[in-house]
Amino acid sequence: MANVVENLGKLERRVTISLPKDTVQKEIDARIQKLAKTVRMPGFRPGKVPLKMVAQQYAGQVEAEVLSDKIGQEFFTVSRAENLRVAGQPSFEPKQEQAEDAYAFDATFEVYPEVKIGDLATAEVERSTTSIGDAEIDRTLDILRKQRVHYHARGEAGEHGDGGADTAAKNGDRVTVDFVGKIEDVAFQGGTAEDFPFVLGEGRMLPEFETAALGLKVGEQRTFDLKFPDDYHGKDVAGKTAQFTVTMKKIEWPHLPEIDAEFAKSLGIEDGDLTKMRAEIKENLEREAKRRTQSIVKNQVMDALLKISELDVPKALIEQDQQRLVEMARQDLAQRGVPNAKDAPIPAEMFAEQAERRVKLGLVLAELVKANGLEAKPEQIRAEVDEFAKSYEDPKEVVRWYYSNQQRLAEMEAFVVESNVVDFVLGKAKVTDKEVSFEALASASAQA
């Protein structure tokens, strides 16, 4: 007899699952007999417990397990017979009216939606482009020099000079201070320190504190008021005004390494050739620019696809993805060293909007890939792995690392599929190219 599938909504369905009681009972009896061979009870050797006693002890548990298994199997059979594309897990409830010879359950579930993707020619995408020139290379060299900065005591002669005649603390100097802070003449936790180092101008300290330290010479001190921000991480002092006295103990001026052969060697240029160094920096910047532009345009393409697509999103899939995002958040907390991160009370509701977008986008992409043959080809995956490996010291080892793990390879395959989708959409959409600076590109990709 054909199963009747009821429509309860746009995606929600219900079907009745019927299980003959004699079939269920046979399975229960078989499992109890199997269980009796290993079950232990006081006063009996293993495998010698009377079958009746085993049944009395475990019948309820075994019946529940058998019904669960049989219902799942029957639902799978029915869903295949009725060509149902079930989204998520069904829920089963016993029917109020039961036949004498069968168990009857209502299975309620959702099905995958029909996905309608509009005309790609109407999609609008802005594609960022950037060029790497001497200015970008020089800025990168400046960053690299600052990463290798070392300090010398101001006023003391050394191989790099004495830092100038002015021995007062300036922005960029590393200073070492003692300080004492009080609120209404009472010291507070964290308000006192000795030999405390920081670099002026880095923003590590509150602005009033840095301003007070600027211009001081070794041995000088200054007293000043400092109002803690209302959102300051130290709740006991947030919003309050403290009086600090800071004493300058040491002032060191920054010396940046010269851009010479030794500097080039420190960047991995074995012969110290500056032209090679700049060429390699340019190549790395171009690779980074390509990665960032691809990321930005991918997000634009995904947004454009969502705008022109129509579909209902199964709640079951959204709920599953919410839980997945909760677990990802807990893993992130654990990696940051947060205690008991795996049990952190993170409400799934906070990911509702993000999960709905992810699920909706996944359904749209799946439809687009299937309809247009955009699956990842093995040679495409290998090309992306090779490209990724180029930025490492031993590319061959990185390639082996990828191909030794199916999960890592699957992640790269998903990346290739997304790239295929992006290229396909860009070939049909209204695309506007926009030249942006590398700095603007970096800022945009950080916000994406």
Curated annotation (Swiss-Prot):
Location (main, coarse): cytoplasm
Pfam families with a match to the protein in the record: FKBP_C (PF00254), Trigger_C (PF05698), Trigger_N (PF05697)
Key words of the record: Cell cycle, Cell division, Chaperone, Cytoplasm, Isomerase, Rotamase
In terms of superkingdom, the source organism counts as Bacteria
Instruction: List GO BP terms, alphabetically.
Output: 'de novo' cotranslational protein folding; cell division; chaperone-mediated protein folding; protein transport; protein unfolding
Tell me its family. Answer: Belongs to the FKBP-type PPIase family. Tig subfamily.
The protein's name in its UniProt record: Trigger factor
Species: Burkholderia cenocepacia (strain HI2424)
Q: Which gene encodes it?
A: tig
